[in-house]
Amino acid sequence: MFAPTRRYLDLTIALLILFGGLFVFHYAKFIVLNFKPYHLAAYWTLITERNTERILNSEKAQGIPVLLFHGVLPDDDFKNSSESTIETNTSLSKFKEQLYALKRDGWNTISLSDFQDYMSGKKELPRKSFLLTFDDGRKDSFYPVDPILQSLGYQAVLFIITDKTLNHSYSEGSFYLSREELESMMDSGRWDIAAHASHEHTYVTTSDENGTGVALANRIWNEDQKDYETESEYRDRVLKSMVDAKTAIQNQFNFVVSDYAFPYGNYGQRDSNYDNAESIIRSAVDQVFSRSYYQVSPNSGLDFYNHPNQHNNRFIARVKASSEFSGEDLVSILNKAEPVSLPFTYETSEQIFGNWANVSDVADDSGLILTTKDKNTSAFATVKNSSRWSDYKFTARVDEFNGQAISLVSYFVNDQNYYACTFSPGYLRIHKKQDERLVALKEVKIKSNQLLPADLMIGLNNERKIVCSLGGSGIISDETVDGGES
C-alpha cells in the first residue's frame, strides 16, 4: 500500500514542479531571453538593497512632479556614447543612485491611475509623491529598470511608440519591446502603458533646401509639388497620428488610454516651420486625450509641479532626470521646487528666481537687490513655486530704483504672458502682457511728487481680479485671471 501511494505523491510533486516552472518561465522568459551582463547590477539590488517599505507622509501633496527617463545603458557604453545619446539616456549606476536617493529622502512613486484621480480632484496623495515615466517603449527602459523598481517598491509609466512596439511579435534583437513583452510588464503590476506616438515619432522634410524637423510640429515639404502640405492636410495628419496611437493601444490591451506624451517633447512651441502649429497640436490632443505631457527644464524658474483643478491641469509638465544630476542633486531639485504656501515672507534671495536678473541680498539681510543680467536693459525675478497662490496680496517696499518704471508681476506664465502693477513717475498702471503685446488695462494718476521709499502692492482678490496700489492710490482690474507665478 505504501509504495503506490509514495509513487503517486512523487508524481504529484514532479507535476507541480513542472507546471510551476512553466508558470515562472511564462512570466520570466523575456527576462531570460533578453538578459545582458549589465542587468546583473540591477538584479543584485534585489538582494543587497531591497527596501520595499513605503514611508507614508502625513502631509498632503500640493502638487506632483513627473520625472522623465529614456534608456538605461551599461556604464561603459554610456561613457563612450555620442553627445546626443548621453543627453537622452542615463547610465545604470546613475539611475540607481538617483532612485535610491529619492527613496531615502521619502519620495514614493504613484500609479498612472493615482495621478489621473489626483489631477481630476478625486483623490489626495501624500507629500513627496511622484510619477516616474519612460518614453518610446525601448527594451533598455525595462530590463535593467524593473529589478530596481521591484527592490524599491516603485511603479512606472511607459509611453510607447505604437508602430515600433505593437506591430511586431517578440524578437530578441529588436530595440523596442513587443506587444507580448508589454503585456508581461503590465501583468507585474509595476508598469502602466500610455501613448507617445504612432508613426509620427520621426523627422520629415520641412523645406526645399532639404531641411528636416519633427514630424508632428512641422508641415511637410512636398518636393514633387514644390509646396508644403496644406493647413487642412497638416491638421488632419496631426489628429490622425494621435487617434492611431490611442486606438492601437486600446485595441491591443482593451483599456482606455487617456495620456499622451508629445514626441521629442515638441508640441509646436519650438523648431517649427508653421506659426499655427502649437494651436493645431494643442487642439488635436485635447480632442483625443485627457492629459498631454511636455518637458520643462528644472532651471527655467517655472513651476514644474502639477496641480489639480487648475486651468492647465490637462497639460502636464515633466522634468528630465539628467544624467548630470547626482542623486542628491535630483532630490534637491524636487524639494526646492515644492509649492510655496501662504503666508509667505521674504527671507533670502534663494527664494527668488532671477528670470533675467542677478539676485542678491542686501548686506544686512533687510532686502533684495535686482540688477541687470548680461546685456538686458531690465531686471526681472519671480518668487519660486508660487503658481497656486490665490486671494492674496504681495507687498514690496521699494527703496530706490534706476530706470523708467518698476513692476510687481502676477499670473506669470512666461516672459511674454503676465499681469503687472507698474509704477512710473506720475502714474500707477495695471499692465497685461500677452503674446508679446503689452496693454495698460487701467491707470490712475498719482501725485507727481510721490517719492520712494514706498510700498508697492499687487494682489489677487477673491474674484480673481488684479488689485494694485502705491501708498494711498489703488486700482482694480476689470477682467479675471487664472494661475501663474507671482
PLM region descriptions:
Residues 1-18:
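N-terminal Sec-pathway targeting helices
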Residues 25-129, 314, 318, 323, ...:
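N-terminal pre-catalytic segment of deacetylase/amide-hydrolase enzymes
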Residues 49-54, 115-118, 141-146, 170-186, ...:
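Alpha-helical scaffolding within the catalytic cores
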Residues 67-74, 128-130, 150-267:
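Metal-dependent polysaccharide deacetylase catalytic core of the NodB/CE4 family, i.e.
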Residues 161, 220-225, 230, 255-259, ...:
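His/Asp/Glu-enriched short active-site or ligand-binding loop at hydrolase and phosphoryl-transfer sites
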Residues 332-360:
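Extracellular carbohydrate-recognition regions
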Residues 372-434:
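Secretory/extracellular carbohydrate-interaction modules
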Residues 396, 448-483:
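Carbohydrate-binding surfaces in secreted/extracellular proteins
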